[in-house]
Amino acid sequence: QPHRHFQLLRRSKFEISCPREKWFLEMKSNNISDCSLKKNIIVSSFNFLENSATLYELYLELSEKLGLGHPINDEKPRFPYNILITNNWIAIIKRSYDHIHGFSINSLGFAGYLLVTEKSDINYLRNYGPEKLLESFV
């Protein structure tokens, strides 16, 4: 990963965090990995407002479980990844690719905010849908 950045999405207390929040919450409670997308994502409950001091430890634990490594043993992560942190849950997505079918997907893409540009293969998206597009990145 050549760079890292945060993207903050402000939400009111009872507003959903992202369009795919229900999907992430269902993944958290269901360990069935019926597609490569689900096999490369780890989701955990986390109360950010009450436990912000332990966020880094949870991040390290989840990163190791997903096979990304640990800063003590690995100079850099073993795989590129994206991370989503809400007030109630955290998700880490292990990626294999940065660009596919003219799309560049970051954390917001996995959250449900796909950016379509003139380079994007809109026909691929129409024919296979967003889930298949996201799956091709892992």
Residue ranges and their predicted role:
Residues 1-138:
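HIT superfamily nucleotide-processing domains
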